[in-house]
């Protein structure tokens, strides 16, 4: 318990596997005795607890298996599924830790032995194992095969702890009774036994031999593999030398953790308890003696993309002849096959010498080699055919058939653009200025001149002619201009058809000016579009501006809105505040009504007729004018009733013709700080209009006159 790293402790009414973190001692009432506590951490959880050393047990594989069997026998559904999953995961981690710990202990023992032997620098003697002890006590007749019905499990031993040279050493000889010496290449790949054999009707056994890659250091080192079969071993010195000279390599797959602990070969030094003994997981490779040249030897199996290897295509002949399969368990879930690993089936042994047997070619191996190669080629062709079929199924249609809307606008493109109150109309892009994000477009209409200048519009207001909203835009245009938009679409369609047929190559404007478009252009009725759509493309032909370089256009000036009216309204607002809020003109108005001050506007009102058609108000904003008039009505009710009775005039006319001018003139004089006479002249002159305001007013008069004439 003092050295245990993993224990079983009780936590939350269950036995949980845990890892020991620390050990502490606590004194009790009896000073001679101390209580030991363990600080442990539950596996697969971050929970850390403190338990007594007397309440824990050392973690063993048998305990985990017992707990797992009890969980499997439960028929009730667990109350807390998440807790149950965490408990099962902890048990699984504990089982993996125990399995990995056994493998690490074997590898560490083999590594220490290997380091000791490398320091000595001398050939190591044969290391005894349970398999060797059994082989030394058996008679020779049992080794070479007997006709007894009793079968023993083949015991395969792989050495990972000895390395020596035997190419030129005369003492490097193997006694058939003692077994083979073991050697290991520290830098070579891990080589493990591929499997065992079974006894046939004649009593002979099939031997499976393993070869390792020869490591040449200084030109005099070779590697040897040991074989323990029924407790006996055969000599393989000559074949090992051939292997070292040719540099061949046959490696076996790694072994899963499925070997019983009581198996004597499982406890042998250097044995990996990962793969069941006697199992063969890859197609056999031919004898090295059967290859006359290195190029004739079959290549290693090519690994798949997912790291696995192809399964063997044919069954082994000894198995088909009635040989019993290996009694070892099947490959477990931890089985892994390296891409460089293959297995080899050796020839059946005889009473003759082993060296003479290996020098002869094996027909079964050659036949099996050809079958494996043919099966591999057929599988390769089938996989290639399946890949091609999948590519054909995933083939996409040509990109020409798929329309992708372009992201930018270029010269000559057909677009949609909305002109004022009219719907979106087809147009042609004449020029693009990416820096200003502007484009010049020319509308497609009945009397379009390709040499005319277009309208400069923003790129954001344009839409490609084949956009997603094309049908919607067409329907909106057909509501008021069905015949006109139909002619535009037919012209564009004819242009695209001629481009596709190859009868015309050029831009849309070139097509419109060419004779090839005349049949479509002549179908338009006289002035059909001109009467409904304005002359959008009016202007002079594009010519270089005088004083500018050839071909360079005069920069387009941005037309700002007219702000003259807004400026006058802000100035008049000061006059309104002076009259209404400050009541600065009230004393002046009272003096006029009481005849204390002479008034030009009062004299004109008294001497003029009652019918006046036009009144100059000076104030342009109706809201400002309403405020001033309401204020003047209050002043008139207080003072001007007697004057109105004397004159028998209209109250509204009196306010507009007398009080309003006097109040505005008084406000101008006070705000602008001028005398009364100058303020009166400014009032009579009225607001100063800008040139653009006069032009707009004149155009409105002309439109009104034309409308009346129609």
Swiss-Prot record:
GO terms, biological process: chromatin organization; DNA repair
Residue stretches making up the PWWP domain: 411-472
Gene3D superfamilies: 2.30.30.140, 6.10.300.20
Molecular-function GO term, any one: nucleosome binding
A Pfam family matched in the record: PWP3A-B_N
Transmembrane segments: none
Family that this chain belongs to: Belongs to the PWWP3A family.
PANTHER family the UniProt entry points to: PWWP DOMAIN-CONTAINING DNA REPAIR FACTOR 3 FAMILY MEMBER, PWWP DOMAIN-CONTAINING DNA REPAIR FACTOR 3A
Domain observations: The PWWP domain mediates the interaction with nucleosomes.
Function (record text): Involved in the DNA damage response pathway by contributing to the maintenance of chromatin architecture. Recruited to the vicinity of DNA breaks by TP53BP1 and plays an accessory role to facilitate damage-induced chromatin changes and promoting chromatin relaxation. Required for efficient DNA repair and cell survival following DNA damage.
The protein, known as: PWWP domain-containing DNA repair factor 3A
Species this protein is from: Homo sapiens (Human)
Gene that specifies this protein: PWWP3A
């Amino acid at each position: 318990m003092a050295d245990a790293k993993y224990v079983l402790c009780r936590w939350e009414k269950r036995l949980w596997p845990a890892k020991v973190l620390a050990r502490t001692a606590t004194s009790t009432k009896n000073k001679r005795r101390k209580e030991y506590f363990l600080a442990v951490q539950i596996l697969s959880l971050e929970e850390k607890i403190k338990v007594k050393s007397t309440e824990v047990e050392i973690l063993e594989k048998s305990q985990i298996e017992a707990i797992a069997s009890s969980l499997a026998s439960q028929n009730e559904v667990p109350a807390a599924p998440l807790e149950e999953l965490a408990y099962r995961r902890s048990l699984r981690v504990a089982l993996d830790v125990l399995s990995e710990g056994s493998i690490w202990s074997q590898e560490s023992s083999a590594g220490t032995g290997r380091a000791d032997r490398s320091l000595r620098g001398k050939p190591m003697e044969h290391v005894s194992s349970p398999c060797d002890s059994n082989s030394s006590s058996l008679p020779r007749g049992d080794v070479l095969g007997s006709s007894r019905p009793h079968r023993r499990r083949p015991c395969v031993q792989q050495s990972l702890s000895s390395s020596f040279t035997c190419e030129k050493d005369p003492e490097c000889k193997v006694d058939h009774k003692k077994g083979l010496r073991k050697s290991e290449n520290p830098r070579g790949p891990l080589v493990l036994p591929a499997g065992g054999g079974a006894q046939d009707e004649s009593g002979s056994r099939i031997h499976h031999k393993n070869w390792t890659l020869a490591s040449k250091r200084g030109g005099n080192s070779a590697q040897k593999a040991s074989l323990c079969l029924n407790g006996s071993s055969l000599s393989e010195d000559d074949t090992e030398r051939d292997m070292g000279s040719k540099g061949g390599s046959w490696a076996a797959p790694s072994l899963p953790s499925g070997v019983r602990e009581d198996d004597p070969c499982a406890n042998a030094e250097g044995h990996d308890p990962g793969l069941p003994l006697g199992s063969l997981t890859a197609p056999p490779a031919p004898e090295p003696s059967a290859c006359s040249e290195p190029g004739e030897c079959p290549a290693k199996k090519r690994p798949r993309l997912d790291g696995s290897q192809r399964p063997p295509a044919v069954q082994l002949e000894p198995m088909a002849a009635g040989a019993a399969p290996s009694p070892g368990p099947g490959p477990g879930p931890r089985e892994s096959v390296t891409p460089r690993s293959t297995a080899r089936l050796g020839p059946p042994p005889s009473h003759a010498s082993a060296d003479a047997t290996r020098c002869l070619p094996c027909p079964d191996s050659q036949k099996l080699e050809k079958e494996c190669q043919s099966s591999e080629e057929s599988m390769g062709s089938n996989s290639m055919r399946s890949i091609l079929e999948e590519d054909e199924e995933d083939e996409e249609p040509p990109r020409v058939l798929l329309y992708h809307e372009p992201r930018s606008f270029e010269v000559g493109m057909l677009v949609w653009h909305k002109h004022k109150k009219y719907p979106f109309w087809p147009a042609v892009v004449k020029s693009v200025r990416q820096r200003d994000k502007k484009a010049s477009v020319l509308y497609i209409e009945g009397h379009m001149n390709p040499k005319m200048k277009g309208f400069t519009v923003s790129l954001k207001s344009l839409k490609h002619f084949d956009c997603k909203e094309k049908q919607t835009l067409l329907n909106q245009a057909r509501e008021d201009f069905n015949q006109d938009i139909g002619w535009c679409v037919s012209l564009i369609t004819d242009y695209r058809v001629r481009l596709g047929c190859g009868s015309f190559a050029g831009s849309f404007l070139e097509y419109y000016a060419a004779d090839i478009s005349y049949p479509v252009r002549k179908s338009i009725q006289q002035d059909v579009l001109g009467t409904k759509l304005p002359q959008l493309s009016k202007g002079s032909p594009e010519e270089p501006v005088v004083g500018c370089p050839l071909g360079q256009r005069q920069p387009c000036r941005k037309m700002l809105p007219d702000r003259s009216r807004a400026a006058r309204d802000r100035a008049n607002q000061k006059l309104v505040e002076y009259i209404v809020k400050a009541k600065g003109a009230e004393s002046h108005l009272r003096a006029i009504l009481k005849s204390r001050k002479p008034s030009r506007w009062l004299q004109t009102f008294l001497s003029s007729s009652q019918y006046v058609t036009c009144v100059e108000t000076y104030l342009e904003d109706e809201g400002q004018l309403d405020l001033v008039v309401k204020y003047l009505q209050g002043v008139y009710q207080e003072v001007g009733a007697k004057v109105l009775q004397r004159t028998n005039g209209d109250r509204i006319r009196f306010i507009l013709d007398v009080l309003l001018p006097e109040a505005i003139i008084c406000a101008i004089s006070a705000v602008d700080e001028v005398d009364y006479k100058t303020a009166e002249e400014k009032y009579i002159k009225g607001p100063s209009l800008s040139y653009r305001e006069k032009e707009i007013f004149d155009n409105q008069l002309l439109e009104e006159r034309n409308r009346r004439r129609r």
